[in-house]
Amino acid sequence: MTTFELFPADVHNKRTIQQGHPPGWTNRRGGEYDLVVLGGGPTGLVAAMTAAAGGHHVAITEQRLTGGTCVNFGCTPSKALIRCARAVHDAARGAEFGFRLDTPPQIDFAAVMERVRRMRSMSSAGDAVDAVEQTGAEVYLGHARFTAPNVVEVDGRQLRFRKAVIATGSDPFVPPIEGLRAGEYLTNESVFSLTELPARLVVIGGGPLACELAQAFRRLGSEVDLVSNTQSLMPRDEPEAGELIRRRFEQEGLRLHLGSKAVRVTSGRLAVHGPAGTRELHYDALLLGTGRIPNVGHLDLEAASVRFSNSGVQVDEYLRTSNPNIFAAGDVAFPEKFTHAAMATARLCVTNALNGANRRATELVVPHCTYTDPEVAQVGLTPDRAREEGVAIDEYRLELAKVERAFLDGEEEGFAVIYTRRGTGEIVGATLVAAHAGEMISELILTMTHKVPLEVVAETIHCYPTQAEVFQRIALQYASTRKGTVPIWGIPAAKGGDRINEEPAK
């Protein structure tokens, strides 16, 4: 029986452990199962619960905490921290809204992190071992590995299966930097154990995790340097979005070192080589936000005739591995490493493995959102990807400052752009930069998933005044370009003068 620890050992972390890896838990003796799922994160839990709900005999294994990275070390604690940081930032903007604090906000970082741990323990209750067992799935805690093409072993217990799903997720990538030693840096798995605010924080990376936490710690009072070997922030998103976030970061006092490489660590100093040469950054804490790598080690995949590489478990479009009875889903096999994508692939795996379906993972419409302020949400094609795939597109765009609710809220920084297949209303992609982009983008995910054309968005009544009106206003741009199709619902007159007039379609 394995054990697990979290620091600090307060009531919240003890509760998280009790829920996700109960001390004294005794595994069953093994047996035969319709489905064995390796990994108790979001992917594995959805796969196991879906199969159990369908009446199948299911086992699920987990070496650490049920709930996996997302609820324990990723999405849940990071968003709790970001919310605290946004509250501090909003308080500092009081003069914009007609109030003034007699003294600057005093940040109690220990209380901030206590709230993060409390939120985590509350959220993880839904993924607790007992909760999983109540769905009918049988939980085995410990290290799982294949011993044959149809057998998984967990701490000496033999689990024979008809089908299996590998859902072991991913681990933080640690770059090869001279002098970087384990225990001397933070990742997403250790940063939420902090109890004291680092006065000086260096963040390596330019993707979602690095950007989100760099901004959050800056707002909470740390001096922050962000180092990225890319020329822009969030390089997988549209360049304009990354540039907007760069400007916001610099306005908030983050020091950015883009196009720079971290080359050496020595006693609280990081040597960085960039366009202007090599310089040293002093820090009290060093956070790695350099991406993730699939967790394929120690599974003995060879014993099950499952092919894999450093990129993860190799699967076909149905998420089936080289062993036709074994599937893989989530971060360990799917390029889009997001919790929502992981859960979608889990459902697809179960449908294909146990119900005889042939659903393709390539059919999934997978969005993503980076929870900076403003947030950056994207779905489908960008212009660069459209060119790579040979898809001709039309572009319809609106600045958020021209949406009345956005400037009323003081959240006008951002924009929305929708791409359609050239000459049609078929939506093939969209980017939204807005304070609440993650909440708003689902309208376009729905339209793309169900192939709803842009003219239907134009016809759909949206509540006024809301920031989500940005999509209808863009859709009305499109409708106005259709020859002989001036819509009877009309293009609403702009309010506030030129500030919120629609921009012409490109």
Q: What would you call each of these model-derived segments?
A:
Residues 7-10, 38-43, 47-64, 76, ...:
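Flexible, glycine-rich terminal cap/loop adjacent to redox cofactors
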Residues 26-43, 197-207:
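Beta1/beta-strand and adjacent pyrophosphate-binding region of the FAD-binding site
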Residues 101-102, 138-141, 145-153, 159, ...:
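A Rossmann-like FAD-binding core segment of flavoenzymes
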Residues 181-198, 280-355, 458:
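FAD-site-proximal beta/loop scaffold in flavoenzymes
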Residues 195-237, 338:
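Rossmann-like NAD(P)H-binding beta-loop-alpha module
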